[in-house]
């Protein structure tokens, strides 16, 4: 069984000031998605599903997909690609969209867009985050171990200290889990940064307190492992969400919220998988030079070929 990689690439990139998913950062203009796909193929994945916005679908296909025409899976078969759009009006038929809403419905809604094209265990990632080789290996192994299972999902947790930006505070969901390494909840913390004294601090979004955080705390970078039964469970929660928030202009349906609902209802468990990989990405424009330098370093060290694709 070859897992599927689901890439969330519909984000607007407002803080960065452009479509981060299409920004060339590698030595030969490679995008972060290019590296994610390379790592996923090496980890045994067989299909890539992109979730994009309709207005840049064709540009996205031309810029990204043409690079992979010669990419083969581990078994020598061609890597499969599917493109799906996330649009505001893609909601259950019994609901009528508020015509004033412009904001996308959120990450969990984006995942639901792929329900008809994914029938195997799959991994969700952001299109503008670099997760590292070990993360894809760990997530791919989890998928293969859970083929045919239901109600057990996974989150790949990154050490908080491996996810900070030198250009400003970041928001991170801190993972809390029990003795069996099952997720209990994800608590969003805002404005996280390392202070002058070397201590990491941030604002707890639940209590409002400015708190000290451990550098080794595991946090979510939106890398999840799911089996196909997730779609039905999440779809039912989305309908309840719409019943309560249909007329809201800003409320979003996020993956951690859907998972939290399942955990509270006892309908699913979520394994917390720890990765040694360092995350990096372009949260702010000021992050870009450091990311470009990091990819150049990885190429010099032989971690990746250059160019990445031929």
Q: PLM features: what roles do these ranges have?
A:
Residues 133-223:
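Conserved core of the sugar-phosphate nucleotidyltransferase
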Residues 1-7, 13, 30-124, 131-132, ...:
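Conserved N-terminal catalytic core of the sugar/cofactor nucleotidyltransferase
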Residues 264, 269, 279-310:
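Hydrophobic helical membrane-anchoring modules
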Residues 235-268:
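A C-terminal functional module that forms or caps the active site or interfaces directly
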Residues 22, 175-177, 272:
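A structural signal for short hydrophobic beta-strand segments in well-ordered beta-sheet cores
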Residues 93-104, 168-173, 286-290:
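Short, surface-exposed amphipathic charged segments that create phosphate/polyanion-binding patches used
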């Amino acid at each position: 069984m070859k897992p599927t990689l689901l890439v969330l690439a519909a984000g607007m990139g407002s803080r960065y000031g452009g479509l981060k998913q299409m920004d060339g950062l590698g030595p030969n203009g490679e995008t972060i998605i290019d590296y994610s796909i390379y790592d996923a193929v090496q980890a045994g994945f067989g299909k890539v599903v992109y979730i994009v916005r309709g207005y840049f679908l064709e540009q996205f296909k031309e810029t990204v997909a043409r690079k992979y025409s010669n990419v083969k899976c581990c078994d020598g078969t061609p890597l499969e690609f599917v493109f799906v759009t996330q649009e505001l009006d893609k909601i259950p038929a019994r609901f009528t969209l508020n015509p004033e809403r412009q904001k996308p419905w959120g990450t969990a809604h984006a995942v639901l867009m792929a329900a008809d094209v994914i029938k195997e265990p799959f991994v969700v990632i952001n299109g503008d985050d670099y997760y590292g080789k070990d993360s894809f290996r760990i997530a791919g192994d989890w998928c293969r171990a859970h083929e045919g299972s239901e109600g057990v999902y996974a989150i790949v947790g990154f050490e908080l200290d491996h996810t900070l930006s030198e250009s400003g505070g970041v928001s991170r969901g801190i993972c809390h889990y029990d003795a069996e390494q099952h997720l209990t909840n994800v608590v969003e913390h805002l404005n996280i940064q390392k202070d002058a004294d070397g201590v990491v601090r941030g604002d707890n979004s639940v209590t409002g307190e400015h708190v000290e955080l451990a550098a080794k705390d595991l946090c979510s970078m939106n890398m999840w492992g799911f089996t196909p039964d997730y779609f039905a469970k999440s779809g039912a929660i989305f309908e309840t969400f719409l019943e309560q928030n249909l007329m809201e202009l800003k409320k979003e349906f996020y993956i951690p919220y859907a998972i939290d609902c399942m955990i509270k209802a006892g309908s699913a468990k979520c394994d917390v998988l720890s990765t040694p990989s360092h995350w990096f990405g372009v949260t702010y424009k000021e992050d870009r030079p450091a990311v470009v330098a990091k990819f150049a370093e990885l190429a010099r060290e032989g971690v990746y070929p250059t160019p990445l694709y031929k």
